């Protein structure tokens, strides 16, 4: 990191929210954006969703990476997105870069039903667990993660899975599948992987776990 980027960070980061802040605007942006991806994955053909995601990736990600080496561009972009940015993103790729990359990754590797449910986990379990953990997380597991946030993520993922399967006419093993999926989503939200942003790791880990569960309980056969 060069001195221009360091000095810019020192000047600006006090004006931006930290990870430990509730940051409602960011959570609303996150839920709205990821839920929109879910709707696209649900109502558009898989290849159309991937094309639209690829276009969004090409528009956003290169600019996000270039700004890290161009102080003037970085200052302009961070000023535009200040309401939804964190201070640690001033000199690192934004969460949206990891999110778009992660969704394209799972979209290429996993069935649409798994991708759709993983997007629901990311849209709602992640911000709700974060909110509960920040406001009420007195029992820490490690770092900023708490048991309160973990159980919030579990409950949200359980409810989302139950609703996802129920409205697709699947009742067989719905309770046990939903309970296991809730645990998978909560673990995906909890466990850090080599300091990679959870906007990438959560959908990937959720998709891996859900694929195993859906295969074991023959859920894919009912989703055809």
Task: Describe each region flagged by the PLM.
Residues 2-52, 65-167, 172-216, 220-223:
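Interhelical loop and helix-boundary elements at the membrane-water interface
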Residues 58-62:
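Central hydrophobic cores of alpha-helical transmembrane segments in multi-pass inner-membrane proteins
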């Amino acid at each position: 990191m060069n001195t221009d980027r360091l000095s810019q960070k020192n000047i600006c980061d006090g004006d931006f929210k930290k990870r430990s802040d509730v940051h409602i605007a960011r959570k609303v942006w996150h839920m709205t954006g990821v839920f929109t991806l879910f709707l696209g994955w649900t109502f558009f053909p898989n290849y159309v969703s991937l094309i639209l995601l690829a276009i969004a990736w090409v528009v956003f990600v290169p600019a996000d990476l270039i700004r890290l080496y161009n102080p003037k561009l970085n200052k302009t972009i961070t000023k535009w997105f200040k309401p939804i940015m964190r201070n640690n993103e001033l000199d690192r790729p934004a969460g949206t870069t990891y999110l778009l990359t992660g969704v394209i990754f799972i979209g290429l590797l996993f069935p649409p039903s798994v991708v759709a449910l993983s997007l629901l986990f990311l849209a709602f379990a992640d911000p709700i667990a974060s909110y509960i953990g920040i406001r009420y997380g007195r029992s820490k597991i490690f770092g900023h993660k708490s048991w309160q946030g973990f159980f919030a993520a579990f409950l949200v993922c359980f409810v989302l899975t139950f609703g996802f399967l129920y409205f697709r006419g699947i009742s067989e093993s719905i309770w046990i599948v939903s309970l296991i999926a809730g645990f998978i989503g909560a673990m995906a939200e909890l466990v850090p992987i080599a300091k990679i942003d959870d906007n990438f790791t959560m959908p990937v880990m959720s998709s891996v776990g859900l694929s195993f569960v859906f295969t074991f309980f023959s859920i894919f056969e009912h989703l055809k």
